[in-house]
């Protein structure tokens, strides 16, 4: 669920994402969403550190549109780590043929 994006395609077998875990989404416009809520880039670290659920679970899934530059995704991942998240799962589309 969450904000719709075109995920990168992979040949990896499908792994089930835990439905109750929070999802961080990066759209092709490089907008960032925590769950269904848009979070400005300059407020992301604060949003992560003040989210009680994330600070308890310390786990988050990241999905990014396949057109988002790698450097931008890397910056978001660094902010996630600074925000105290210890486990970050990357969501892809396992049906890819590339």
Regions found by a protein language model. Name each.
Residues 1-98:
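Long, low-hydrophobicity, acidic/polar, solvent-exposed interaction domains
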């Amino acid at each position: 669920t969450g904000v719709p994006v075109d995920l990168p395609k992979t040949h990896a077998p499908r792994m089930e994402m835990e439905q109750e875990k929070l999802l961080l989404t990066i759209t092709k416009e490089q907008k960032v969403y925590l769950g269904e809520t848009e979070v400005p880039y300059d407020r992301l670290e604060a949003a992560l550190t003040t989210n009680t659920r994330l600070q308890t679970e310390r786990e988050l899934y990241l999905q990014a549109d396949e057109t988002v530059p790698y450097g931008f995704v890397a910056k978001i991942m660094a902010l996630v780590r600074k925000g105290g998240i210890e486990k970050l799962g990357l969501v892809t589309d396992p049906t890819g043929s590339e």
